[in-house]
Amino acid sequence: MRLILLGAPGAGKGTQATFICQKYGIPQISTGDMLRAAVKAGTPLGVEAKKIMDAGALVSDDLIINLVKERIAQPDCAKGFLFDGFPRTIPQADAMKAAGVKIDYVLEIDVPFEAIIERMSGRRSHTASGRTYHVKYNPPKVEGKDDVTGEPLIQREDDKEETVRKRLEVYSAQTRPLVEYYSSWAKTSPQAAPKYRAISGMGGVDEITERAFQALSS
């Protein structure tokens, strides 16, 4: 099972990725983890990436594709892999296609933006313990206070509505076009293209997992 998982920030990709990887016995690969591992291992590509990152520049798509090819050749990818947050742009998807990286499925978890904003901007956390709440779906017993210590809860910068909206704008401009890219590729050349599946990311975690498993067996 060689899989790309697509979806906006806050669509629940991370949660579903864990379940999918467990079911199929495959590793979850993100470009961030991959870069860190290559830098730590001191591979030639890792050394090159470190120089670029230390200079505050962005790692090129070519280098990332080479890292991807190196990563998926490792023994833990024998049964496949799940790409989370990669490819992020059309040029990356084109580069992956040109490099002959084979993908079986592209799975999109679709959640309306307004639902994501409500989901993320309603999160509250207790910094010391890591406990998290949601003003609507999992409220604390006393508004704004941690259930155990009674200490005040905070809203993380990442969860503020303005930040969430900005991240969704970036996603719309850069990554959302991949949905069209993979769905139209699947329609025009079904033999060569990965199977494209979209599921709703609304509802309970178990329901969404069930939808994901059904989509990946069809």
UniProtKB/Swiss-Prot annotation:
A Gene Ontology cellular-component term: cytoplasm
Catalysed reactions, as listed in the record: AMP + ATP = 2 ADP
InterPro entries from the UniProt entry: Adenyl_kin_sub, Adenylat/UMP-CMP_kin, Adenylat_kinase_CS, Adenylate_kinase_lid-dom, P-loop_NTPase
Residues annotated for AMP binding in this entry: T31, R36, A57, L58, V59, G85, F86, P87, R88, Q92, R156, R167
Subcellular location: Cytoplasm
Keyword terms: ATP-binding, Cytoplasm, Kinase, Nucleotide biosynthesis, Nucleotide-binding, Transferase
GO molecular function annotations of the record: adenylate kinase activity; ATP binding
Name of the featured protein: Adenylate kinase
Species name: Polaromonas sp. (strain JS666 / ATCC BAA-500)
Lineage: Bacteria, Pseudomonadati, Pseudomonadota, Betaproteobacteria, Burkholderiales
Gene: adk
